[in-house]
Every structure is written in structure tokens, then in C-alpha cells.
Amino acid sequence: MSRVLPGKSVNQTNRTKFLVELIKPSHYDDDGYLIQWWRGFVPSSSLSNLYGLALDAQSRNILGEDVDLDIEAHDETNKNLPVAGIIRRFKRNANRGIVLLVGVQTNQFARAVDIARELRAAGIPVAIGGFHVSGCLAMLPETPPEMKDALALGITLFAGEAEHRLDELLRAAFENRLPPVYNFMADLPGMEGGPLPFLPMKYVKRYAGALGCFDAGRGCPFSCSFCTIINVQGRKSRYRSANDIEQLVRAHAAQGVKSFFITDDNFARNKNWEAILDRIIELKRRDRLKINIIMQVDTMCHKIPHFVEKSVRAGCKKVFIGLENINPDSLKGASKGQNRITEYRKMLQAWKKAKVLTYAGYILGFPSDTPASIERDIAIIQRELPIDIMEFFMLTPLPGSKDHQEMYLRGERMEVDTNKYDAEHATADHPRMSAAEWQDIYQRAWHLYYSPSHIETLIKRAVASGMRSRRMTSMIFYFYGSHAFEHVHPLQGGILRRKPRTQRRPGYKRENPLSFFVRRTRETLTTYLPGLWFFHRLERLRKKIENDPASKHYMDVALSPVVDGEYDADLELYHASDSAVRAADQARARAEEMRKIEVRRAAAG
């Protein structure tokens, strides 16, 4: 069986063609326009996985020796989706084929159904899969209204993972017997030795930096109440082998892809992490492959022997860390007890010492949060934690999470518009903030963290740590600029916004071409001129700091080495709340107990 088959499909005139259109939908902004770019920033792991599975099915002639799969992929975040063209292709092929809307998150579900509605009106078979469908069917006692509406249109809903199941779906579509629902949530497939994720270069180049992606594993052992991963992918670690990863990397490298985003929710808890990193290190050494990696990890990864070191040797230049909050009560309430604030400084300094740029996700809206406490916590982070890039999220009860399930069962108010479940909108009531206050502090949090003085501090820390200052400023521009100028979250960001006039959300008036052109021109100028000026000032500041010899010796509280007994020091991180004081006391007690154990061992030795 072919594991990765990036070659051309065979299409001869005497053979039957079966169309497979893979679509990763975008979602709508607050004005009803699609969020779409000339180049996207974040690649779709689901699209890569489904394309690889479809290639494997193609190589095995699953529909018969005389039937060819004609596979096309579309990521709507970086490409105008040719719905009319797809309909024409299917019409020319007597509607033989299927459109699969893949990896559909809750905020993308409304757009996915809008696409499917047009296709179903033309008689084209359509299936929707992804976290929204899987999460709802896994956690809710009944099908939610938006999914019932999809079923009424004749759309097939697919819950679970497509490995070992795509063959059946394609055969059912080929034989015109698609059921309303596939539900494989009770049977999560193994990953080792299976078909591998792949996207041809013509698709990969639509992402900034030609960034490829793959999941080295799925599942997470933790139990965060706001997370959907554990209920959709399970808590048991499933992973690819080192041989799988080598074949995957080689296939991508053959077409010029050298940068990868490992999309595991927590690569540090992938039980095969060391073998995978060792193999990548060997590929870099033996085959001279230039490989760069971005990965996601937890706040305790630095305590895993050799994890940071081998990540760096494998090419890790940037790492995303689920910091979430610095209030232990908030972390405990979200069942995120694995995050210990007393380990934050050690963990961040371990990555800083390794010259790896850190991104930290921070959630606003835990029950104890107020605008004042959020402002205070951001100031503490700026002063005492050597985080590089911060990105903020509003606490959101995502379907598939325990939070959503419990709120649903209690009958609590939640936003009915799935398009707003993007972690940028208030989708539930907060006990201490109004929706307006919550929304306001979310907007201000970005400006508070990326203040002019702290941007200067971030660049100074980068230079003092031996990091590339240009990497720091480019990430500041991308993350802060996405919010400040494009008004979207960086994870939905990209280069040069497209805003197709004709693809506005149903219910919004389609603008007159002339008035749209005038407004869009004004909007473009007021977005990119300030953005370019900000970039100019960033570059000027970067060069100034680079050229200052004193910058290499810069030191502040965040960079100061962690020392024994620092829990008693004047660090507000450990004194900002009663729960922070308790966390420091517990860390102090653990350290003392470890000291006593070492003393006893030395005495016995």
C-alpha cells in the first residue's frame, strides 16, 4: 500500500472519474464578510490528513480498477472558493463525486452549511466533519438545531476520524447510499503505519513561508474543562512512528517544504516524542535536510529529560505554550492542575536559554477575572515572566468541551450564532463582568501587553538572550498587527486581506459595487498605512537596540535566574492572590521535602 502518493492521477477517456473536493471553510467577520487572505498563516492539519487519505484510497482503486479519484483541495482562508466552478465540474461529470467540508470548527459551521446549501441545491453529495460535529455528538444528549438544519438539507454529518473510514464514505457516495450520519466517536483509530498527511506544493505555497503541517499524535491525558481535544480525540495518546514521520518529512522535502507545524495539542505528552525527534535530528545530520519546527507543549515540558534540548536540535525555533492564566484558582476551576505558576519562570527560561521564541495563550474570562485583575495580571507577566509573544482568548464554551456540556444541561444562556465561537466574542454570561466589559478588556489586553515600552523590552530580551531580533519583531508585527490593524485574531490572520463582495453571509445586504469599492479602498488605506508605519517604527527600534552594545548585557526581573527560595522574594506572581500565596507555600514545602530526601540519600550513601 502506498503511504504517500504525491504523483499524478491517471485520467483516461475510457475510465470513470469520481470527483473528491476537499474544502476547509473560513468563517465570517462581524460585517458578514469572509476572512480570507492572499497568504494564510496557519495551515489546516485536517486538510492535509484528508488529502493524504484520499491519495491512499486513489492508489488502491477502492471504487474499482476503472474508476479514478480526481482530488482537489481548497483552504478558503487563502483561496476564493469557486463554488460555481465546482458545480460546473460536477454537472459535467453527472454529479459523480462528493464534497467533503473538513476540520469544521464551531465558528466555521455556519459558513460550511452555506457552502453546502448551494452544492446540495445542485444535487451534489456533501458531508461535513470536524470538531463541531464530533464534539456535539460526543457530548450532547440531542442534536443541536444547526446540525438538524444541515441534515434537513441532505448533508451527511461525519463524527470521528476518517482513517479506515474514508473508503466506506467514498463507496457510499459512489453508490448513492450516503446515510445522514456517520458516528465513529466510540472507535478512535490507531495512527501508526497508516496513510500520511500530505498536500502538494501548489496548496502549501498559499501559506506564508510555505508552511507544512502534520499531527504526530492525537489525544491528551489532561482534563481541562474548556478543551474539546480530550472529548473528540480522547485522553489516550495515539501517535505516528518515527518511520512514519521520516517518510512524511521526506515527501514534503522533495517538493521544497522545510518548515512544519506539528499540530499535536501537546507534543510533549506524545509518548513517541523522543523517537520522533531523534529521527528528525538524524535526517538533519545524515541527509543535510534543513528542517524548522513549530510545536505546541504544556507548561511542565521542561521537566521531561532532554525534551527542550532535542526539540532544539530537531529544528524547533518557535513553541506555543498553553499558559492560560496566572491565577491558580482559575486554573484549578478549569481542571488544569498540571499548570503550576511556580514552574512558569523555570519553563520559560529553559526555552529562552535555548533561543526558542515562545508564544503563550492566555484566556480571559475565568470566573474570578475582572477588568482590574486582568490588567494587574498582564503587568505581572510583563515584569516577571520572560514570555515573548502573548495571544489572548475569551473563555468560550466550545461544543465538545465539558464546560459547554454542563452549561447546556443546566440550561444556561449561550450564544446561538455558531459563527461567534471564535474566542473573540462573549458567548456566555460572566459572573463579574458584563458582556461589554468583557469584550472591552479583551480588546485592551492586546494593547496593554504590546505597549511601546514592553515591545522595547521584548526586543532587548531577545538580543540579550542571543535570539534573532528580527524574528521577534516579525512575530510582534504579525500577532499584534493582526489584532490592531486587521481586527482579527492572529490564528485567523494572514497577508493581505481579501474581502469578496459577492460572498457575504446570508442575511447581510450585498453592497453596491461602487460603494463597496470606495469603502474597501478607504478601509485598505486605513489598515495598511498605519500598519506599515508601525512596522517601520519596529524596525527602527530593533536596529537601535541591536546597535547598542549595552543591549547584550540587558537584565531584568523576568530574565534573572530562578533561585532557591524565590517564592519568598518580592515577586508579585506569588503574592497577587490568596491562591498564588498557597501555590508558593506548596512549592516551598515540596522543595524542602526534596532537600530532606537528598540529605538522607547523601547520609546513606
Predicted regions and their residues:
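Radical SAM enzyme core and accessory elements
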Residues: 1-22, 91-96, 115-121, 425-605
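Short helix-capping segments at alpha-helix termini
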Residues: 61-64, 119-124, 283-290, 354-355, ...
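Radical SAM [4Fe-4S] cluster-binding motif and immediate context
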Residues: 192-359, 364-366, 370-372, 376-379
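Structural recognition of alpha->loop->beta junctions
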Residues: 142-167, 310-318, 376-392
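Short acidic (Asp/Glu) and glycine-rich catalytic loops that position anionic groups and cofactors
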Residues: 29-31, 225-228, 254-260, 356, ...
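Acidic, low-complexity intrinsically disordered segments
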Residues: 2-255
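Conserved beta-strand positions
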Residues: 22, 101, 128, 262-264, ...
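Flexible glycine/acidic-rich beta-alpha junction loops that bind and position SAM and/or redox cofactors
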Residues: 29-30, 133-139, 165-166, 222, ...
